[in-house]
């Protein structure tokens, strides 16, 4: 389950940051989940809560934001979103993209010109977009 590995990496990053900043407590963490990753938000949240247990981040608010997948055709310049073509993909293909987002080029093509030569503008990956900490003596 790669969600636990993602949660572990997020937790280690949050705790490292908090330590470097001299935090007494982590109040909140905001995590952006790229739509192409199709990450199980509930699993990541549960894993983070478990991994935060016994640390200065225990009880921190965990906020998720999904970043929609956007593509740009290198052939004709057309920009489109995954949600515009997702219904045309069968479940197996969606699962393949979930586990290996790089395969998206094999399964998608520009809805305007049909080219498979496109870039992923956004919506790939997982990253921390904010960490709210508290230092001793602050509220």
Swiss-Prot record:
Keywords: Metal-binding, Nickel, Zinc
UniProt KW Metal-binding keyword: yes
One Pfam short name: HypA
GO molecular function (one): zinc ion binding
Ligand binding (Ni(2+)): 2
UniProt cross-references to PROSITE patterns, sorted A to Z: HYPA
Entry-linked Gene3D superfamilies: 3.30.2320.80
A biological process from GO: protein maturation
RNA-binding keyword on record: no
Binding site for Zn(2+): 73, 76, 110, 113
Similarity section: Belongs to the HypA/HybF family.
PANTHER family hit by this protein: HYDROGENASE MATURATION FACTOR HYPA
Function of the protein: Involved in the maturation of [NiFe] hydrogenases. Required for nickel insertion into the metal center of the hydrogenase.
Name of this chain's protein: Hydrogenase maturation factor HypA
Annotated organism of origin: Pyrococcus furiosus (strain ATCC 43587 / DSM 3638 / JCM 8422 / Vc1)
Recorded name of the encoding gene: hypA
């Amino acid at each position: 389950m790669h969600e636990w590995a993602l949660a572990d990496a997020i937790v280690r990053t949050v705790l490292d940051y908090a330590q470097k900043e001299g935090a007494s407590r982590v109040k909140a963490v905001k995590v952006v989940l790229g739509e192409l990753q199709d990450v199980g938000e509930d699993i990541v949240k549960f894993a983070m809560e478990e991994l935060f247990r016994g640390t200065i981040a225990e009880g921190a608010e965990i906020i998720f934001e999904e970043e929609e997948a956007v593509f740009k055709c290198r052939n004709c310049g057309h920009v489109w979103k995954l949600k515009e073509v997702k219904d045309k993909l069968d479940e197996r293909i969606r699962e393949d993209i979930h586990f290996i987002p790089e395969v998206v080029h094999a399964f998608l093509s520009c809805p305007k010109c049909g080219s498979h030569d496109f870039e992923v503008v956004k919506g790939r990956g997982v990253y921390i977009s904010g960490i709210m900490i508290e230092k001793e003596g602050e509220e």
